[in-house]
Amino acid sequence: MNSISIFADSEFDGVRIDKYLSVVFPDLSRSFIQKAIDCGNVSVNGKTVAKNYKLKTDERIEYIPLEPVKLEVKAQNIPLDIVYEDDDLLVVNKPKGMVVHPAPGNYENTLVNALLFHCKDSLSGINGVLRPGIVHRIDKDTSGLLIVAKNDFSHRALAEQIKAHSFTREYRAVTIGHLKESSGRVVAPIGRNPKDRKKMAVTDKNSKNAVTNYEVLREYRGYSLLKLRLETGRTHQIRVHMAYLGHPIAGDFVYGTPRTKEELALNGQCLHAGLIGFIHPRTNEYLEFTSDLPLYFKKFIGGLTVDE
């Protein structure tokens, strides 16, 4: 495959090579670019470099695109709870326990498999074969609303809104214990946990700014029901921030320790994405959608004792 040669402009002096390439090739994900670097397909002045290499002005970068891997994600007739749909996008209410997109070792029964059956070829291709239409994600064991793009125009416009933090995203969660304040704003950067790379953590190292607003709606014996609104959308943000405050989400095996059989029965965090708002990419109209608390959530809080 032919290589691509480019020279680093002065504005990118000191910028990491992987970040630079993600700007030059906006349709490639950062993880795809990092894989190309790790495979030796990126060189600077004739020498292969690590993904954290920092560029200098006028250095010559050569990129050899990775050979495409032929992956076929099959369409599956899995029921979808579609809240809204038009020619550009759809809003889906994802159930707890469903993975959003395929990944190594898990290529079936995901939201993407269901979308491929429902939408056929009408999904954006920006995020590649494994993530068609996927603009943003919520965790497997988080239920609630997701936006799916049907074409690249919509995908780019929605992605820009996410980048600008102009999406409205509101969640409900049950957390362990009672918070000191009835409402608050958590401003704490989130990055990979240096001791466990599979987890995120509040850290100053290689982290991104993260802001979560919360309001206590009701207190139960040993638990609290919260409304949370995101200003940013980092991986596991709500789960990490609540654990950081000392009040992990009920049922969260990763950032907390489920204490009761009722928590264990949740099979993951008691967290629901109940509201999402955005500007429609084609009409420029603000749209907002809500989702009622699902059965697992209602059942859990129904078994709690309200604090008087």
Regions found by a protein language model. Give the residues of each.
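RNA pseudouridine synthases
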Residues: 1-185, 189-191, 296-300
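A short, aromatic/hydrophobic, helix- or strand-capping loop or linear motif
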Residues: 31, 202, 254
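Conserved "cap/hinge" positions at secondary-structure junctions
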Residues: 46, 65, 240, 258-259
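Short, P/G- and charge-enriched loop/turn segments at secondary-structure junctions
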Residues: 78, 198-203, 261-265
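Conserved hydrophobic positions within beta-strands
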Residues: 82, 175, 213-216, 249
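Active-site flanking residues adjacent to catalytic metal/cofactor-binding acidic residues
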Residues: 92, 240, 251
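The conserved catalytic core of RNA pseudouridine synthases
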Residues: 128-160, 167-168, 172, 187, ...
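RNA substrate-recognition surfaces in RNA-acting enzymes
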Residues: 250-281, 287
